[in-house]
UniProtKB/Swiss-Prot annotation:
Organism listed in the record: Arabidopsis thaliana
Pfam family, one: peroxidase
Protein known as: Peroxidase 59
CDD domains linked: secretory_peroxidase
Sorted UniProt keywords: Calcium, Disulfide bond, Glycoprotein, Heme, Hydrogen peroxide, Iron, Metal-binding, Oxidoreductase, Peroxidase, Pyrrolidone carboxylic acid, Secreted, Signal
Molecular functions (GO terms): heme binding; lactoperoxidase activity; metal ion binding
Species classification: Eukaryota, Viridiplantae, Streptophyta, Embryophyta, Tracheophyta
Listed GO biological process terms: hydrogen peroxide catabolic process; response to oxidative stress
Name of the gene this protein is made from: PER59
Protein's job: Removal of H(2)O(2), oxidation of toxic reductants, biosynthesis and degradation of lignin, suberization, auxin catabolism, response to environmental stresses such as wounding, pathogen attack and oxidative stress. These functions might be dependent on each isozyme/isoform in each plant tissue.
Residues involved in Ca(2+) 1 binding: D71, V74, G76, D78, S80
Subcellular compartments: Secreted
Positions of substrate binding: P163
Binding residue positions for Ca(2+) 2: T194, D245, T248, T251, D253
PANTHER family, per the entry: PEROXIDASE 59, PEROXIDASE 72-RELATED
Residues linked to a glycan: N182, N209, N239, N281, N310
Amino acid sequence: MKTQTKVMGGHVLLTVFTLCMLCSGVRAQLSPDIYAKSCPNLVQIVRKQVAIALKAEIRMAASLIRLHFHDCFVNGCDASLLLDGADSEKLAIPNINSARGFEVIDTIKAAVENACPGVVSCADILTLAARDSVVLSGGPGWRVALGRKDGLVANQNSANNLPSPFEPLDAIIAKFVAVNLNITDVVALSGAHTFGQAKCAVFSNRLFNFTGLGNPDATLETSLLSNLQTVCPLGGNSNITAPLDRSTTDTFDNNYFKNLLEGKGLLSSDQILFSSDLAVNTTKKLVEAYSRSQSLFFRDFTCAMIRMGNISNGASGEVRTNCRVINN
């Protein structure tokens, strides 16, 4: 059957039937309509609050989708990342002084609790917020299957093992495979770096002594290298940020992949999808395909988000009233 799409509000909304054909199965206990009676205005409430947050700070869109990614890769999509405490995943190396948007989720949760107390999990709210961040930035939309429970424990050790911008491609692929995602998902989800910012701390290793012999990363385009060396000088402030996509910084599109073809990926983990030796037989052709076809990227990204949103560790959970702490 032909893929059907509807253009709505400047983004592509894939039909539910098409998504069912394209993407692997949704967890049996999840359904887009699970709150149809218990919280009928949920989707509108979340969308409104995300829109307010993005109006206040457009960068928040990328931050919210990153929260969802970092949550799902640890214990499954159970909002364990949102828990405070000494063993919080927020304190793991990939998240500390980096993960952001927790206050936005708190605000959304408060609005949802006001309308439907004790009904909607923080995990579902985070999943919806990630989707809305994409849509409100010009990306594709999809119906989110709901019914996740909030985890009872955080897992800081596992959070320390999240895919890293410093890792080689084979290690990154292995971490995706470990949570039942595939190479297409690796490339499609990396496309979320089409918006947002990154700190000098996570890419400055490419700028001056990448090889250990005093040379920068040879795959980095020369004019971008020169600019980044000015933004992130040796011994400078590692918390300064640079856009992941300089051309369309706040728009969700396929420009990220066009950048990779030109050596303009900001993170090492971005550029290796196209330039590394391993990429030749794994990810390079996908990068090229997505650079040519935004609709193909949107389709595969949507499917990858649905699959990632299905990650579960099978543990029991609850519906937290406060996303930062388990219920008494």
